[in-house]
Design a protein with these regions (language model features):
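Short acidic-aromatic low-complexity motifs
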Residues: 1-19
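A solvent-exposed, acidic/Ser-Thr-rich amphipathic alpha-helical stretch
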Residues: 17-68
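Short, surface-exposed coil-to-beta transition loops
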Residues: 56-58, 73, 86-91
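A short hydrophobic beta-strand element
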Residues: 67-76
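Hydrophobic beta-strand positions in extracellular immunoglobulin-like domains
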Residues: 76-78, 96
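Short, cysteine-centered beta-strand-loop-beta hairpins and adjacent loop/turn segments enriched
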Residues: 78-85
């Protein structure tokens, strides 16, 4: 989660397998749905550019790991260029294979996300 908080998209992508997929819940155009590694990187770069610090800080609150699956409850915080504060709660489910993240499911408060990024 530390690498996310720095906003270094290339470093973030280095943790993903070449065929990784990242799914975000909800119906937010440009954010929700399934993305491949390249699409996810483009989305991250775009979102990071909307923040004052160039990143959305992520703080893990609780972890559960079993086999190749890791679930993480997380809180984010960022001051946005539009003057709003992005402070969301997430549940991430990671599937790790051969030392790389292969699949991610991201559950979050979509209404807060929509209000901050699109409102």
């Amino acid at each position: 989660m530390e690498v996310f908080s720095r906003g270094d998209v290339d470093a973030i992508l280095s943790y993903l397998a070449p065929t990784a997929t990242w799914w975000v819940g909800g119906g937010i155009e440009g954010i929700s749905g399934t993305k491949n590694k390249e699409e996810f990187g483009a989305m991250l770069a775009g979102l990071s550019a909307t923040t004052k610090s160039g990143a959305i800080a992520l703080k893990p609150l609780a972890w559960t790991a079993e086999g190749e699956r890791v679930a993480v409850e997380t809180e984010s915080y960022s001051e946005m260029n539009n003057g709003k504060i992005y402070n969301n709660l997430y549940h991430f489910v990671f599937v790790v294979r051969d030392g790389k993240i292969d699949e991610v499911k991201e559950f979050l408060d979509t209404e807060h996300t929509r209000a901050v990024f699109l409102g």
